[in-house]
C-alpha cells in the first residue's frame, strides 16, 4: 500500500501544471473520513473562488487523476475541489511571505521556551525567520521562529 503522503506528492505533481492562473493550488490532502477516503484539492484565486470555479476545476482535475499509472489509490475515493477557507494552510515560504500582517497559527517540531504552538500576528518573515506577536496570558510578546522548525502553519481566525 502506498503511504498517504506519497499519494499527496503524486497528485500534486500531476495536477499542478493543469491549475492555470488566476488559480493557485494551495494544498492537496488525502485522508480517511468515516468509512470513505477523500482526496481534497484546495484551490484559491484573488477575490476567492466560486462554485462554478470548483466545478470547472473538477472537470480539469478528475480526468488527470485517472491517468496516473500505476493507480496509487488503495480504494475508491471521493474527489473534493474546494476553497481553503478562512484557516488556509501556509505550506510554502511564499505563502508565509504573503501572510505578513495576518493572524496565524504555527506548530513547531520542537518547542521554544516550552511552547510548541504559537498563535498571533505575523510581523515579518525574511525566508529564514518568522517574527510573531502573540499573547502570553495578558501580555504581548514577540517570538522569532526559525523557518526550519515549523511543522505546520495556517491562517487563523482571531476571536
UniProtKB/Swiss-Prot annotation:
Pfam families: DUF150_C, RimP_N
Keyword Transport carried by entry: no
Annotated Gene Ontology cellular component terms: cytosol
Subcellular location: Cytoplasm
Keyword tags: Cytoplasm, Ribosome biogenesis
InterPro entries: Ribosome_maturation_RimP, RimP_C, RimP_C_sf, RimP_N, RimP_N_sf
Family matches, as CDD domains: YlxS_C
TM ranges: none
Coiled coil: none
Main location: cytoplasm
The keyword Metal-binding is annotated on this UniProt entry: no
Family of this protein: Belongs to the RimP family.
Free-text function comment from the UniProt entry: Required for maturation of 30S ribosomal subunits.
HAMAP family, alphabetized: RimP
Name of this chain's protein: Ribosome maturation factor RimP
Source organism phylogeny: Bacteria, Bacillati, Bacillota, Bacilli, Lactobacillales
